[in-house]
Amino acid sequence: MSQQLLEELGRRQYRTDIPEFRVGDTVRVGVKVVEGNRERVQDFEGVVIRRRGEGINENFTVRRIASHGIGVERTFLLHAPRIDYIKVIRQGKVRRAKLYYLRGRTGKAARIRERR
């Protein structure tokens, strides 16, 4: 009984406005941030280095290089209500499902070819 209830709740949370994107793509994720009584949308742009899970539990990790060359990674639930939008900026061409090797690279070594 509880499994059916969980599946029903999951179906209500499903989002249909999510674009198709893969590992290696550069995306811009709009995250809703609450500050006091105000709510605003904060952009986080970077390369998708991982997608995992399926259904309502699917998530993805985005990596970007912040100021002073420090890498920042954020993991988002794909169907989370906190995500306002996801925009695909650039489509990358990679041969791996997980791009963890980018953690050890900076600058030109961390570039990804563009998919046509």
Curated annotation (Swiss-Prot):
Gene3D superfamilies listed in its UniProt record: 2.30.30.790
Single GO molecular function: structural constituent of ribosome
Keyword Ribonucleoprotein among UniProt keywords: yes
UniProtKB keywords: Ribonucleoprotein, Ribosomal protein
Gene Ontology BP annotations: translation
GO cellular component, as recorded: cytosolic large ribosomal subunit
Stored InterPro entries: Ribosomal_bL19 (IPR001857), Ribosomal_bL19_CS (IPR018257), Ribosomal_bL19_sf (IPR038657), Translation_prot_SH3-like_sf (IPR008991)
Function: This protein is located at the 30S-50S ribosomal subunit interface and may play a role in the structure and function of the aminoacyl-tRNA binding site.
Family stated for the protein in its record: Belongs to the bacterial ribosomal protein bL19 family.
Name this protein carries in UniProt: Large ribosomal subunit protein bL19
Species whose genome carries this gene: Chloroflexus aggregans (strain MD-66 / DSM 9485)
Taxonomic lineage of the native organism: Bacteria, Bacillati, Chloroflexota, Chloroflexia, Chloroflexales
